[in-house]
Amino acid sequence: MRHLLAATLMLLAACSGGQTVSLTVDDAHYRPPLVDGGTGVAYFAITSKIADRIVAVSSPRARAVEIHESTSDQGMAVMELRPGVDLPPGKTVKFEPGGLHLMVIAPQPLTAGATFPIQIELESGRVQTIAFAGAPAS
């Protein structure tokens, strides 16, 4: 529930310019890298009321953020960079282990109790910042 509340508050703040909120984000959580300078990963579920497309992702706390998808090809696990992800109206798109996910490259360390911000840029021109709940790497 805490994950949903944080993500919802960030979405509301991003849309406070008279726009209606047309995105819902659930279970936004971030796994930091095991070693400094490594790669973290972020997972979430997103639902758009209108047809849209995620065209870019970024974070002020990382060198880069990329959309990746894990698949299986002839029994071998394959991870591919995706240029974007379609958001069909009313359908939930899940970013989860073994499928779509965000790779967070060279992120700054996360302190206890902090969230990790990731911006999602949509084809419609909207930009949403999502606060991903996480825990410091141990």
Description of each model-found segment:
Residues M1-L4:
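Positively charged n-region of N-terminal signal peptides that target proteins for export
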Residues C15-Q19:
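Bacterial signal peptide processing site
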Residues S22-S138:
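Compact, glycine-rich, soluble single-domain proteins
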